[in-house]
């Protein structure tokens, strides 16, 4: 890991004015979650249709996946499509749901080569067959990879997730499989869509907006939040590395002193 980190640091300092002299390879956030925001405003400011922003944003995904893998981050969760996104214009929704297929068709060989494991967090209900096929194929072909977990939050909403978890738990109580007094935080976590993942250490939201948009509300209770005033299509590896540096300069207390 240290050798890999040293190579990254040299590449970084060769291309950027600011040297990350204080970054600690032993204190890398294990799980980074990102709300990829600002595609539409990026396009509007350039006089382009919103889908042009989403297309450009897909290029940013490539950069950040590589950056996360280089830093040996264990999990990268990307908020790709929320349950609220269905309310957008039909043409935009159709384009957004084609992006996973386009991305995976183009990048799956590289993801396999770089030992990345693809996972999905969200409801499959309502997703088009071409999206499901692309995601399922990627999950199957990368399931034995042991490097970065690339977790796509697709058709995901935290309130829906929590409601579903409560329904599952209530059913177990009703059937006598679980006593109400035995329900713990761990019980709830085990019934969430993210039950196969540790909670995020760092949550990044781009575009400067200061809200969580129904994203992993249970899981980010003790995450460090970083709201960055840059649209997602303009978000670079440099921004990502600066986010990691900011995380390392904070003291995580988990509710303590």
UniProtKB/Swiss-Prot annotation:
Tagged with keyword Kinase: no
Protein name per the record: Isoprenyl transferase
Species of the source: Shouchella clausii (strain KSM-K16) (Alkalihalobacillus clausii)
Sites where the protein binds Mg(2+): 37, 224
Claim: Nucleotidyltransferase is one of the keywords in the record: no
Top-level enzyme category: transferase
Taxonomic path: Bacteria, Bacillati, Bacillota, Bacilli, Bacillales
Stated family: Belongs to the UPP synthase family.
Superkingdom per UniProt: Bacteria
Entries under CDD domains matching the protein: Cis_IPPS
CC annotations in GO: cytosol
Keywords: Magnesium, Metal-binding, Transferase
Known role: Catalyzes the condensation of isopentenyl diphosphate (IPP) with allylic pyrophosphates generating different type of terpenoids.
């Amino acid at each position: 890991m240290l050798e890999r980190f040293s190579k990254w640091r040299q590449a970084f300092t060769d291309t950027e004015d600011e040297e990350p002299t204080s970054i600690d390879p032993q204190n890398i956030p294990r799980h980074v979650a990102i709300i990829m925001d600002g595609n539409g405003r990026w396009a509007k400011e350039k006089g382009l249709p919103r889908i042009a922003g989403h297309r450009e944003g897909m290029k940013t995904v490539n950069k950040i996946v590589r950056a996360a893998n280089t830093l040996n981050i264990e999990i990268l969760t990307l908020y790709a499509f929320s349950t609220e996104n269905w309310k957008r214009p039909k043409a935009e929704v159709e384009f957004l749901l084609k992006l996973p297929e386009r991305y995976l068709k183009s990048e799956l060989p590289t993801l396999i080569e770089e030992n990345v494991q693809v996972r999905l967090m969200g409801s499959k209900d309502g997703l088009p067959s071409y999206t499901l096929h692309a995601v399922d194929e990627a999950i199957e072909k990368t399931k034995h990879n042991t490097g970065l977990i690339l977790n796509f939050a697709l058709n995901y909403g935290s309130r829906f997730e929590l409601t579903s978890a409560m329904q599952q738990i209530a059913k177990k109580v009703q059937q006598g499989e679980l006593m109400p007094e035995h329900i713990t935080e761990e019980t709830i976590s085990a019934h969430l869509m993210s039950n196969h993942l540790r909670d995020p250490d760092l949550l990044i939201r781009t575009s400067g907006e200061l809200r969580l948009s129904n994203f992993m509300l249970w899981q980010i209770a003790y995450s460090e939040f970083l709201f960055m005033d840059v649209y997602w299509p303009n978000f670079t590896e440099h921004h990502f590395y600066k986010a990691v540096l900011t995380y390392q300069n904070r003291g995580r207390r988990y509710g303590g002193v």
